[in-house]
Amino acid sequence: MKINRVKSLNGEITIPGDKSISHRSIMFGSIADGITEVHGFLNGADCISSMNCFRQMGIDIDYDGCVVTVHGKGLHGLSKPEGTLDVGNSGTTTRLISGILAAQPFASRLIGDASICKRPMKRIMTPLSMMGADITSELGNDCAPLLINGKELHGIYYNSPVASAQVKSCVLLAGLYADGETSVTEPYVSRNHTELMLESFGGNIKAEGTTATVKPVDNLVGQKILVPGDISSAAYFLVAGLITPNSCITIKNVGINPTRDGILEVIKAMGGDMEYSNVVSGCGEPTADITVRTSSLKGCVIEGSIIPKLIDEIPAIAVLACFADGETIIRDAQELKVKESNRIDVMVNALSSMGADITATDDGMIIRGGKPLHGAVIDSHLDHRIAMSFAIAGLNANGDTEITGAECVNISYPGFYDDLGGLER
């Protein structure tokens, strides 16, 4: 994929549905009684992996390209899958489904692609084992493939060493099947889509500060779910509108859940010209249309409790910081090392190759903005967020930027390049 510099970007776009919410809609719909209708489902490879896993366990799921209909079979209605469950590239599928599988009356095996088989799974194996689960790493390296033999579980009070919605959700889902109460406490609040959706399905869930607590219920009830646009996908267009000359972009129906809006806080701190309109709340998930315009930006410090609210947006933020005056420091983001790629090293090396003044640290990076970027050949490492971030950087670099493995955007945003190309230039 070749990207060339543009003179401006203008127009409106509607981004695909939120990936986190789409995953959860399939999972909760499958273990609920009755029908769950999902409007705005993200038809990306990761979410299709979740869909296929539950189909393998006997759940009928219809998808007409607009609406997903999940024919739930209740908390105890899943069937033993024939063969291995393939999660593809999806860490969310791997970790969340493990919490459900840990309590089923059958054994299962989870496998994924090469990236998944390098990502850390001890962070879910530890709390699930504390609950009485039988979960092991087939190769003994605390990574997938995972072998899970369903057991009777008991509730625990778990202090998670990382602020991770995937870890929290895994434990809470297991807690639906456990004897007694299950609580997860995190160092910072992570995204709360599981808590919101579980409550809407009739679960007994309480969230106070950094602790979420679930008690088992007899059943969950299928719902109609309206999936908002994914703020992680919106991030690339927010950055594009802010750094491209003579630009104004409006992104419609973006989810602005307070546990996910870190990039919006950063844009404000950097002095970006941004405004909201049509702010509404549906199914507990607030949305808005967001408009950004070309802005003079200044560097800032990004650290602490905001990091879980923008961890997936940091590659895009790093590009943004290259066009800000002064220094931007990102700290407490060591989680970037265990994403689809080591996003600290990949971003620093690739932006450096484009002429950016950027340095890696143990837990983040330091970007000294203001140096003009030039085109380069960028290896996406088959990481969708890397590919999309450098597409935006390439629009504002001198010369051609070539992204290898650019098709990996299909993981979360299959129409990304079409939407980007559809903006007026």
What kind of region is each of these model predictions?
Residues 1-425:
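Structural preference for solvent-exposed beta-strand-turn elements
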